[in-house]
Regions:
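Acidic/polar-rich alpha-helix caps and helix-coil junctions
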Residues: 1-111
Length: 111
């Protein structure tokens, strides 16, 4: 927080909040939420952290479908230039009959 120019008194006040202070109650959740916030400048890292830990508890935006995407789909050229391997890989990520689905979880994505 110091790197963003936040005053020391404000940092102390923030860290003293029960939703932030580690006190044995939901500590892993608190750490996960703070890590997610710390990744704010790097959205992809925050997205990965959320998928890895499940924190914070996020909901999909209205009109975004059922859920927040869990992975990026393969690029449009992959099935053109490497159809055999693309098909094998995309089949592993089939959800609801959709091959190469963004709703499929990768191996480290927390269920």
């Amino acid at each position: 927080m110091e790197q963003w120019g936040i005053a020391a008194a404000s940092i102390t006040t923030y860290l003293a909040q029960s939703s932030v202070m580690l006190n044995g109650t939901n500590d892993l959740q608190k750490i996960g939420e703070q890590r997610w916030l710390a990744h704010y400048p790097d959205g992809n890292q925050g997205w990965a952290e959320w998928r890895r830990t499940g924190f914070p508890n996020l909901t999909a935006a209205p009109g975004a479908g059922k859920q927040i995407p869990r992975r990026m789909s393969y690029g449009p050229n992959d099935p053109l230039y490497n159809p055999t391997n693309w098909d094998a890989a995309a089949t592993r990520y089939t959800v609801g009959g959709v091959k190469d689905s963004q709703d499929a979880r990768i191996w480290w994505d927390k269920p």
